Amino acid sequence: MPAPAATYERVVYKNPSEYHYMKVCLEFQDCGVGLNAAQFKQLLISAVKDLFGEVDAALPLDILTYEEKTLSAILRICSSGLVKLWSSLTLLGSYKGKKCAFRVIQVSPFLLALSGNSRELVLD
Amino acid sequence: MQTGPYYFVKNLPLHELITPEFISTFIKKGSCYALTYNTNIDEDNTVALVFMITSRNSPMIVSIDLMELSLNLDSKKYERISWSFKEKKPLKFDFLLAWHNTGSEESTMMSYFSKYQIQEHQPKVTLSTVRDLQCPVLQSSELDGAPEVSCQALELFDWLGAVFSNVSLNNEPNNFISTYCCPQPSTVVAKAYLCTITGFILPEKICLLLEHLCHYFDELKLAPWVTLSVQGFADSPVSWGKSEHGFWKGGEHLYNFVIFNNQDYWLQMAVGANDHCPP
């Protein structure tokens, strides 16, 4: 029996992602403070609350990965909340009285894009 | 399977990439690629050699067709370009280089650029095995999935990102830290093999890898599908074909092949907001 003819379908999506993903790192100016995942998330929520209020602090925000040693994380935020989260991270200046800043390393609507970072390519 | 080598050259004057000798040794005898190393496309001058040299420092883009140039090296156009790169604006960059030799002679980048501290590198390969991995159920004929039967192609795309970033896939809906879970319907596979290759990799090597993966299903296998994802350099000034590549919130341009055991395949291509739609 002859094989059926190959079919081809092309679908183009524009802004298909419900979420945006951010790879971030918290840096302290002097000696750091340890934060576990729950404390880290609480810090993010309070940063958004300080700038935008209670309602926006309830934006769905997930910490997909968290490394306590380096205080780095991959965050997932609904796309409509990206600007609010990013601006809150930008304006966060201290935690428990210690000066700190968030570094935003990568942002993408595609989580797969965050699995590598060509800007971090190191040649041995 | 070898996926390299590639080369790193420090402080290479840009005019070295348009000399008749370079063009006849590398450009005409294979596929040669170069990209400036450690230059951010949204901040610095960036140069890429694909089928042409493209230099970009927003909003200026300079494109030079080397093959066209090589047809008439006595032309005023070539003289002007050469003078610009040598005298008017003698730029130097650190370059990543790779070359696919289709000629019979054994020219090498190492000897050609020996006066410029050239180093040879091999792409870094990391292998890992994940046990009891929750995987989305897919149907090759249903890109948009079917309720209770299979997942959407977009859901697979994000799930792949989760797997390669070591994201936990089975969080409860009331978990404070994360509610992310594997798209449904899903199945648990006993073992999944992940391989990451990092470096300046030739398209020809990627094609070979893809061919190998296609042959994976020549014999009967339990796996329903395999995937190959490729990410372009965020700071490349070109994307698919000769399309200009941009960096706004991010410089992502990537593609993913899903090869099914029935020889169907999906090709997913994703670009950032500053790029044109892929071909």
Swiss-Prot record, chain A:
Q: What family is this protein classified in? A: Belongs to the eukaryotic/archaeal RNase P protein component 2 family.
Q: Which organism is it from?
A: Homo sapiens
Q: What biological-process terms (Gene Ontology) are attached?
A: tRNA 5'-leader removal
The record's SUPFAM superfamilies line, in alphabetical order, gives: Rnp2-like
> What's a single GO MF annotation on this record?
ribonuclease P RNA binding
Per UniProt, subcellular location reads as:
Nucleus, Nucleolus
The gene name on file is RPP14
The record describes the protein's role as:
Component of ribonuclease P, a ribonucleoprotein complex that generates mature tRNA molecules by cleaving their 5'-ends.
List the protein's name.
Answer: Ribonuclease P protein subunit p14
Subunit structure, briefly? RNase P consists of a catalytic RNA moiety and about 10 protein subunits; POP1, POP4, POP5, POP7, RPP14, RPP21, RPP25, RPP30, RPP38 and RPP40. Within the RNase P complex, POP1, POP7 and RPP25 form the 'finger' subcomplex, POP5, RPP14, RPP40 and homodimeric RPP30 form the 'palm' subcomplex, and RPP21, POP4 and RPP38 form the 'wrist' subcomplex. All subunits of the RNase P complex interact with the catalytic RNA.
* CC per GO annotation: multimeric ribonuclease P complex; nucleolus; nucleoplasm
Keywords attached to this Swiss-Prot or TrEMBL record, sorted alphabetically, are:
Nucleus, RNA-binding, tRNA processing
InterPro entries to which the protein is assigned, alphabetical = Pop5/Rpp14/Rnp2-like, Rnp2-like_sf
Other facts noted in the record for this chain = This protein is produced by a bicistronic gene which also produces the HTD2 protein from an overlapping reading frame.
